[in-house]
């Protein structure tokens, strides 16, 4: 079992095990990734790996922040929005293809570091969710759509599904890139 799994496994461990699993797969998928590969777009309307990696980090950071009921995030309070030169309001959801194409000139290592910082905040956030808290919503911080604020249970399920899919996207794009060179 991963080191962050609880001593007496419960509902949180499903999410913890899942994020550990896709995290290992993600690290494998980006190992040795060149900046040319990271910014390559299979079609003019496709996301590139670097943007997807950033979005994975933003999702872990945003959902960890939501699980905590607000407060500190790596993106804003931790200064990562400024450091990476991306508008603090963005998380990738709803980004236009022009925003993807015009993603800042960043190194893979910088974006990976942001993801890892966000993940280090996410794990304790998941661990603090008791069974009694699963139906809690935070409309007070979900200001763009307070009437659609998700339950903490929904967040625990959504996070590994979405980021597992994005990890698969990265591996797939990497495979497409290498096949175009053959």
Label the predicted regions.
Residues 2-5, 16-30, 35-94, 137-182:
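Short, contiguous alpha-helical
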Residues 4-17, 105-112:
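Active-site rim elements
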Residues 9-10, 74-77, 83, 107, ...:
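Alpha-helix initiation/capping motif
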Residues 86-136, 155-159:
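Acidic/histidine-rich alpha-helical segments that form the ligand environment
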């Amino acid at each position: 079992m991963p080191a962050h799994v609880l001593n007496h496994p419960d509902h949180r461990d499903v999410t913890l095990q899942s994020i550990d699993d896709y995290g290992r797969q993600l690290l494998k998928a980006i190992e040795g990734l060149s900046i040319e590969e990271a910014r390559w777009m299979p079609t003019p309307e496709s996301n590139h790996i670097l943007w997807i990696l950033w979005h994975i980090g933003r999702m872990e950071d945003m959902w960890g922040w939501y699980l905590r009921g607000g407060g500190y995030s790596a993106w804003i309070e931790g200064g990562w929005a400024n450091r990476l030169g991306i508008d603090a309001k963005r998380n990738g959801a709803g980004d236009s293809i022009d925003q993807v194409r015009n993603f800042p000139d960043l190194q893979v290592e910088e974006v990976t570091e942001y993801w890892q910082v966000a993940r280090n905040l996410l794990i304790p956030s998941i661990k603090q969710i008791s069974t009694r808290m699963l139906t809690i919503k935070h409309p007070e911080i979900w200001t763009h759509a307070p009437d659609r604020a998700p339950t903490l249970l929904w967040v625990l399920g959504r996070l590994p599904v979405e980021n597992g899919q994005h990890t698969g996207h990265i591996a797939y794009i990497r495979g497409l890139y290498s096949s175009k060179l053959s």
